[in-house]
């Protein structure tokens, strides 16, 4: 922050036109015998207590030396070319004003932020009447309050016993130990080598986009099919909760000048993705903004509750460049974000039991399970400890609980569901939160049975996790299988190509096309390897591509009306097209379907570099 101090005999300011979407109330004012602080908030300045107290002490010290009876903090954007974002600058100046006001024995004023203003000043002209200063956040020391309390971690068992994580016996709970080591003891669990799943991603076209920002991906046709199938499946799973669900779409940019957006965004901190524009915009980091902005305009009765709203939100988080991980930690990703609006805490808790069941059901379909971290406020833990014990019972194992003193966030409960990956690292996938703050923040209301206006309790959840993280689990599961000596095989519903037909000669191509037509009519993704390659190479390429069903057809198969099938991980056999269709339909029942996003014939596809 750069500041110019002027000790003024008289200072007046008159508010004119708005200069920013982010602004205070337009209040004009005047002060006599005032130390006027022309303050420019710079990039990197933060509303940190230690930083602001450092500045406040200097201001008050100068004010006392010149015997000023008042102080005026005047937002002034002309002392630096490296300006902070308006929403940051306003917050810094507002908090600086509060600190100075609490410590100075005189009048303290602040001219409004975000306006063009006319001012008149009469400087005393003595040696200390004009001074300049520059302050940097890194030079400030945060003063710890004696009464400040730290988070507390406990291991809570299904029988209700509480343990200090350092004293718990983890012999039968290796996954919990990995989570505790990371969350409680802050041990770096790097895994020691490059994860195997990265090799698989190249096979299916999940790649970094080098011509974009760090942490942005691109998706080849095979990857695109998989991404969109998971998006479809997330909606199906949301509807399985047994409550009405509305699917919406919206924008990914929101104005920081909106009070609700700014206050919610402030909780997210430095990972905000800010867009350079004529107004301050942020890219959303989940679907919350759009869903809440829409639902606030709905007329809701208690009879409508509970209901859910879901959007597959393209979400943005400004992760550090060295922290981005392909398909896991990204700056841009797709989040199937479901918000469930409930009457009160009792109804939210009741619905959360079904939600918890579905979250575990879906991970178990992939052959995995979760180890759970329950972040709770101290008040919630005291009142609802038995609720957490019941969830631990349903998981059938101890859970890690982090108890936070005070109400720091909009939620009272934030559950993180982790897998332990191939390299032994906890990886957060699914989540749900119970939110008591955002309905009021965004003005979302309903009318109860007594005609009283109330704010709903909102559940936030990503049942599958983000689309990319769900696929991360799929590929990590394949890595574990291969590590155990098994042949990795994608779920049939997720396989970009479910059947590949390989004609032995050009004479068999017509029969291959007839079979492909029949399979495609039944909603099966099928392609034909019509390249001028040897049969062994075609089979090998199909196996490298993890095609679940490779069907070789020659004159004998054509005469008999059958297929010679090589099933991935399932041996070789002959079957009719009808039996193969029946088998695949059985494997994909209950899952979404998408067509092939590539030409049917391999000869028409360019190879990827």
From Swiss-Prot:
The catalysed reaction is: tRNA(Thr) + L-threonine + ATP = L-threonyl-tRNA(Thr) + AMP + diphosphate + H(+)
Report residue spans for region: Editing domain: 1-143
Which Enzyme Commission numbers does its entry carry?
6.1.1.3
**Localization:** Cytoplasm
Give the cofactor binding note.
Answer: Binds 1 zinc ion per subunit.
Any one Gene Ontology BP term: threonyl-tRNA aminoacylation
GO terms of molecular function: ATP binding; threonine-tRNA ligase activity; tRNA binding; zinc ion binding
Has keyword Secreted? no
Q: Which cofactor does it need?
A: Zn(2+)
InterPro entries linked: aa-tRNA-synt_IIb, aa-tRNA-synth_II, aa-tRNA-synth_II/BPL/LPL, Anticodon-bd, Anticodon-bd_dom_sf, DTD-like_sf, Thr-tRNA-ligase_IIa, Threonyl-tRNA_syn_edit_dom_arc
Q: Which CDD domains match?
A: ThrRS_anticodon
Location of region: Catalytic: 195-491, 196-491
Annotated keywords: Aminoacyl-tRNA synthetase, ATP-binding, Cytoplasm, Ligase, Metal-binding, Nucleotide-binding, Protein biosynthesis, RNA-binding, tRNA-binding, Zinc
Q: Which GO terms describe its cellular component?
A: cytoplasm
Keyword Metal-binding included in the entry's annotation? yes
Instruction: Write down the superkingdom of origin.
Output: Archaea
PROSITE patterns reported in the protein's UniProt record:
AA_TRNA_LIGASE_II
Q: Which residues bind Zn(2+)?
A: 288, 339, 460
The domain section of the record reads: The N-terminal domain is an archaea-specific tRNA-editing domain that hydrolyzes incorrectly charged L-seryl-tRNA(Thr). Catalysis of tRNA editing is performed by the charged tRNA itself.
Which protein family is named in the record? Belongs to the class-II aminoacyl-tRNA synthetase family.
Function description: Catalyzes the attachment of threonine to tRNA(Thr) in a two-step reaction: L-threonine is first activated by ATP to form Thr-AMP and then transferred to the acceptor end of tRNA(Thr). Also edits incorrectly charged L-seryl-tRNA(Thr).
Could you give the subunit structure recorded for this chain?
Answer: Homodimer.
Designated name of the protein: Threonine--tRNA ligase
Q: Which organism is it from?
A: Pyrobaculum islandicum (strain DSM 4184 / JCM 9189 / GEO3)
Q: Which gene encodes it?
A: thrS
């Amino acid at each position: 922050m750069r500041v110019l101090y002027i000790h003024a005999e008289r200072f007046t300011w008159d508010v004119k036109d708005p200069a920013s979407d982010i602004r205070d109330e337009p209040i004009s004012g005047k002060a006599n015998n005032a130390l006027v602080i022309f303050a420019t908030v710079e990039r990197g300045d933060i509303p940190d207590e230690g930083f602001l107290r450092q500045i406040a002490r200097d201001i008050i010290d100068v004010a006392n030396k010149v015997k000023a009876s008042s102080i005026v903090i005047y937002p002034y954007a002309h002392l630096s070319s490296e300006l902070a974002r308006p929403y940051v600058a306003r917050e810094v100046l507002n908090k600086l004003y509060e600190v100075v006001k609490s410590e100075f024995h005189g009048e303290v004023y602040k001219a409004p932020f975000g306006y063009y203003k006319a001012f008149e000043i009469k400087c005393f002209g003595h040696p200390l009447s004009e001074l300049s200063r520059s302050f940097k956040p890194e030079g400030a020391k945060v003063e710890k309050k004696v009464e400040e309390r730290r988070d507390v971690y406990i291991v809570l068992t299904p029988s209700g016993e509480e343990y200090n994580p350092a004293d718990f016996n983890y012999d039968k709970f290796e996954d919990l130990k990995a989570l505790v080591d990371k969350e409680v003891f802050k041990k770096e669990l790097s895994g020691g080598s490059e994860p195997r799943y990265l090799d698989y991603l190249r096979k299916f076209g999940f790649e970094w986009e080098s011509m974009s920002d760090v942490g942005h991906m691109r998706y080849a046709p095979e990857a695109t099919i998989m991404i969109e199938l998971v998006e479809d499946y997330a909606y199906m799973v949301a509807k399985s909760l047994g409550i009405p669900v509305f699917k919406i779409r919206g924008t990914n940019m929101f104005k920081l000048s909106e009070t609700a957006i700014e206050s919610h965004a402030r909780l997210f901190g430095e990972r905000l993705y800010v867009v350079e524009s004529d107004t301050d915009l942020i890219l959303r980091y989940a679907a919350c903004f759009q869903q809440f902005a829409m639902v606030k305009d709905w007329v809701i009765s208690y009879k409508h509750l509970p209901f859910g709203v879901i959007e597959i939100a393209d979400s943005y988080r400004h992760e550090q460049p060295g922290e981005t991980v392909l398909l896991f930690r990204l700056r841009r990703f797709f989040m199937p974000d479901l918000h469930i609006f409930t009457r009160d805490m009792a109804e939210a808790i009741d619905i959360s039991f079904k939600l918890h069941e579905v979250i575990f059901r879906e991970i178990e379909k992939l052959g995995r399970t979760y180890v759970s971290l329950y972040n709770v406020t101290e008040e919630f833990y005291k009142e609802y400890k038995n609720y957490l014990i019941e969830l631990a019972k349903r998981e059938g194992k101890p859970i890690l609980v982090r108890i936070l003193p005070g109400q720091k966030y909009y939620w009272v409960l934030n559950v993180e569901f982790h897998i332990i990956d191939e390299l032994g690292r906890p990886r957060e996938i699914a989540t749900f939160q119970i939110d008591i703050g955002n309905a009021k923040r965004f003005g979302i209301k309903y009318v109860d049975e007594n005609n009283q206006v109330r704010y709903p309790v909102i559940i936030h959840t990503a049942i599958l996790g983000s689309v990319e993280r769900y696929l991360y689990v799929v590929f990590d599961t394949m890595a574990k299988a291969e590590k155990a000596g098994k042949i990795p095989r994608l779920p049939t519903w997720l396989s970009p190509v479910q059947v590949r037909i390989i004609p032995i000669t050009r004479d068999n191509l017509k029969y291959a096309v007839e079979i492909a037509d029949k399979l495609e009519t039944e909603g099966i993704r099928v392609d034909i390897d019509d390249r001028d390659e040897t049969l062994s190479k075609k089979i090998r390429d199909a196996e490298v591509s993890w095609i679940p069903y490779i069907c070789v057809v020659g004159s004998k198969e054509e005469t008999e009306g059958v297929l010679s099938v090589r099933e991935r991980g399932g041996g070789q056999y002959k079957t009719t097209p009808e039996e193969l269709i029946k088998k695949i339909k059985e494997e994909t029942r209950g899952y979404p379907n998408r067509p092939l996003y590539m030409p049917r014939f391999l000869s028409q596809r360019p190879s990827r570099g």
